Amino acid sequence: MKADNLRILSENGFSVPKFQVVGPNEDIDFSHFETELFAVRSNDAHEDGGKFSYAGQFLTVLNVPKENVKKAVLAVADSYKIRYYEKSLGIKSENNNSSVIIQEMVKASYSGVIFTSNPKGILNDMVIVVGKGIGENVVGDKEETVTYHCYKEGASYKEGSDILFPEHFVKELEKLGNRIEKLFNKPMDIEFAIEDEKIYILQAREITSLDFDLPVRILDNSNIAESYPGVCKKLTRSFAKEVYTKIFTRLGRRALGKSVKYYEDLFPHMVCDFGGRMYYEISSWYDILRLLPLSSKIIPVWQKMLGVESEKITFSKEKPNIYIKSRLLFSFLYLMVVSQRKMRDLSTFFKKEFRYFDKKIEKEDDPKKLYFLFKEMEEIFFREWDLTLINDMVSFLSTYFAGDKVKKSLSLESKKPAEALNDLIYTYKRFGKESPKYRRKREKYIKYYGDRTVGELKLETRTFSTNPESLDKLVEEREKLPLKIKKGKYIYKRKSLARLSTNNREISRLNRSRLFGLMRKLIDKIALKTVGDDIYHLSLEQIRDMIFLGKEFSDEINEERNMLLIYENIPTIRRVELLGNPDIDFCDVQAIEEDGDERKDFLIGRGVSSGRVSGEIIKITDMRKVLLKDVKGKIIATYSTDPGWFLLLDVAKGILAERGSLLSHTAIVARELKKPAVVGIKGLMNQVQTGDIVDIDGNRGYCKIIKRS
């Protein structure tokens, strides 16, 4: 098998050192070899098979001079007698071929292994392990190694030793790995060596540790990154999973009745975390979307509206039967018809219950009673929150079919915080910070919009509600900029389904931010009586055990602190393909700097807000670290935005984002503010730098770099 694979590689143009296959008693023909030193390797009949690799089970002899090759061949053949590996794994070997491979020795400056899929079960993570010298020293842990993780969507990071490996080889090795995987049509384990700037393939075999009987789980953060940007603390991660489980369970029961039992195992897997970041477990969503009428048409629309880049679709469930499809068809049509009335009712219900719980939390200080209030809020609010998912689907479909008309939508709910802030700044300018008028308007702003900020669904996020002084600081900063006062005028707006559903979507998002703000307030009160800010390093289950059972979690808190530091060094990976539920280790992680020579001057994305402007780039990775005066009149380049960014977008000239879709917050606010916007630009943050001069076209969806800084 090993020799067969080498022949295939050689015949397909890969650089394979010259080799010859001989039996232990055969003569060796050295005439076509060009080196004086050789590697003598095993070629057992069962080696490098589909189920068992036999890695390291038989002898390999390196740096063998010509006169000693025959002796090395006999030694390698003799090692076939040892079959402990087969006995321990219950392998029945019938054909013990005793041939041996004689191969030209590569004088390697570096060598290593490429796993085209992470053997732990991450299918789109190519792992490249490199060390100095020959491969035997690397495999035998005799040399320091560095490990590169190269995701097929572009993100890369490394871990391990700081050996001086020329990193331009990483891209070349990645390309070779992809070519070899495509050639054999399966994940491969590839040994390589580098001599004089040339990469040689020494052997290639199938990765045997991957169990493809396990389900493939696809994680995607295309849209969820707006709500949960960056690394999230443990409490946020556990709460997000619980919320999605409750909401989808309720939606399933509403739409499917008793038939929901066939799909209940999916609901705890709607979202998950990976490397400290939140992801949609999109493979579960596909199973649920498959229930819808015309699902083959709806799923691509849904992918497009959420900004999902890969069109690959996988299902873990069998195709639903006609009864389930019929029931859901009628449920779906009914819910679409009543969706806007239901959304109005939900908003009224929310306001009433919000006032009730706000008063209860304000008066309560006992951690046990506060915890019960938290669980009661979950039950009350999320019991009907599945209606927002139905409205989202209505919004996706109606907006998609409305096309460019939706770009002209006016006066959406998400514009109100910006208008209220302008009013507050005007009051500050006219009456001063200590005036009763300013204090009243400040209190009102915090009441309604105090929790609308960057990362508002992350419970650890500090908002204007938790830190009111930060609002004063913002107002003082904005007061120094010219205030734009827009006179209101009556504009007739046809109440199309696209506009109604999109507006209700924004109302529900604002209500959601207020709800999470109330829960944040409750958690902060529990924290004051228990472990302080460390409460955010605990899961909901751990908080319960701490309050009611008196358990102590100092070790777990310290571990979580350390993991957060590691997570911060992992680049954002847009898509992850997992085989089953693998254990993933992240350690000693360093992001890989992209090669500047690969920059492009013309970047393509999706235009989501009309207009064309030229201007200077300001690159933002954390909006909390920039001042409004630094953004004014410039074009923002970022990974993604969320509702807290409207302050920056208001003073910016335009917006470019690596992620996003027509219905992302970036798009909605940009349209309201009439700022050109292009989203979904792959690799944007590696292509532009602060100070670059660019031309962006929000109609056609491109960014042209005119001058680099």
What are these regions (language model features)?
Residues 1-101, 110, 358-366, 615:
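N-terminal beta-alpha lobe that positions the nucleotide/phosphoryl donor
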Residues 5, 190-192, 224, 285, ...:
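Extended, hydrophobic alpha-helical segments in both membrane/secreted and soluble proteins
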Residues 94-96, 156-194:
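A long amphipathic alpha-helix within ATP-dependent nucleotide-binding catalytic cores
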Residues 167, 182-188, 198, 232-236, ...:
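Contiguous hydrophobic, helix-prone segments at protein termini
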Residues 480, 484-502, 517-521, 594-651, ...:
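C-terminal accessory/binding modules appended to enzymatic or scaffolding proteins
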Residues 37-39, 59, 99-100, 113, ...:
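Structural motif
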Residues 137-138, 173-183, 187-188, 196-212, ...:
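Acidic, glycine-rich flexible loop/linker segments
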Residues 3-4, 57-83, 107, 111-162, ...:
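Extended active-site and interfacial segments that coordinate phosphate-rich ligands
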